């Protein structure tokens, strides 16, 4: 990879390191309450590289990438860093959605810096619009929408974490996946899957709350019908995923392929935090054990013992209420 050098204390800093450094300065200077308006939390360098490494890169000379809610461009940079090493790729077409005016100038500066550093031809488009409402006609196949919207080979994202009202424009734009007062993260993930080409891959870091409960049923039904989980990464520590942020939400990384064909297995990996991806535990679990039932619950097993327990549970053909056992949690 071509190295963009910046001397600091005798060290050579690579492209992504420099962008992380600039992002950290932005975090220090921008009040958290301002970033909270957009549900904005930035991805760590280790997490960004791990996410970029999960993709199976298409064997093409030109690849297209979407990063919605791009922030300062950390995930885009991690992808370009990886794609730069692949000789057959000649051109990378990048689309970033970002409508936070506070971070836009930093994003533009970082994307231009990536262009200078990369050995590839990089075409960049920043769309300064609301990622959801600007596409609601397309998503819902409504009159006036684009019947042939642009689709991407790869979608990467760290979506906003922000609960919105059931009457918010983003919620009313996507009734197929929303129930009650939804969270922006799963609305973004749904649109990301919509923006993906058939058989394309999407890697997102999102809270794990969507994996169960009636509240998320519409989202799970859409997401796991239109796409299939291939890889889930779990963090054992809930407070070490976003280094400089106070995020106590349990977070996971998911890799999804846009296909109707169900894979035989799902890979489930786990690490203690975002800094020890080199020390992963890994399980290969039958898909029907992980994604099960008409409610599309996702069971996040972490070891072989849990897999065996789940196999036994799935053999039960009745629920506890069905046999007269009432429970409260």
Language model segments and positions:
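Signature of N6-adenine DNA methyltransferases within the class I
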Residues: 36-37, 41-50, 70-77, 89-91, ...
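S-adenosyl-L-methionine
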Residues: 5, 13-58
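Conserved SAM-binding strand-loop segment of SAM-dependent methyltransferases
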Residues: 120-131
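Short, conserved SAM-binding/catalytic segment
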Residues: 107-121
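Conserved S-adenosyl-L-methionine
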Residues: 82-93
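Conserved Rossmann-like nucleotide-binding pocket used by diverse enzymes
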Residues: 66, 95, 127
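Conserved class I S-adenosyl-L-methionine
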Residues: 62-71
């Amino acid at each position: 990879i071509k190295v963009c050098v910046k001397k600091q204390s005798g060290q050579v800093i690579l492209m992504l390191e420099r962008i992380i450094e600039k992002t950290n300065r932005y975090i220090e200077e921008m009040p958290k309450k301002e970033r909270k308006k957009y549900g904005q939390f930035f991805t760590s360098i280790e997490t960004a590289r791990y996410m970029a490494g999960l993709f199976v890169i298409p064997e093409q000379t030109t690849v297209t990438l979407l990063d919605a809610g791009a922030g300062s461009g950390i995930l885009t940079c991690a992808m370009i860093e990886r794609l730069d090493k692949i000789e057959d790729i000649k051109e990378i077409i990048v689309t970033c959605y970002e409508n936070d005016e506070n971070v836009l100038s930093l994003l533009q500066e970082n994307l231009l810096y990536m262009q200078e550093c990369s050995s590839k031809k990089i075409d960049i488009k920043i769309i300064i619009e609301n990622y959801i409402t600007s596409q609601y006609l397309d998503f819902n196949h409504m009159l006036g929408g684009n019947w042939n919207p642009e689709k991407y080979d790869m979608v990467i994202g760290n979506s906003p974490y922000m609960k919105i009202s059931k009457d918010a424009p983003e919620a009313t734009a996507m009734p197929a996946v929303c129930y009650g007062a939804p969270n922006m993260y799963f609305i973004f993930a749904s649109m990301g899957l919509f923006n993906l080409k058939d058989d394309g891959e999407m890697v997102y870091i999102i809270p794990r709350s969507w994996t169960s409960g009636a509240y998320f049923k519409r989202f799970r039904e859409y997401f796991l019908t239109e796409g299939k989980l291939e890889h889930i990464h779990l963090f054992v520590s809930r407070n070490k995923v976003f280094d400089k942020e106070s995020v106590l939400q349990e977070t996971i990384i998911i890799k999804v392929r846009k296909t109707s064909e169900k894979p035989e297995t799902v890979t489930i990996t786990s690490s203690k935090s975002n800094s020890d991806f080199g020390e992963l535990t890994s399980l290969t679990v039958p898909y029907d054990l992980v994604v099960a039932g008409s409610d599309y619950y996702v069971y996040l097993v972490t070891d072989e013992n849990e897999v065996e327990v789940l196999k036994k549970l799935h053999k039960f053909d009745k629920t506890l209420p069905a046999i007269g056992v009432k429970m409260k949690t």
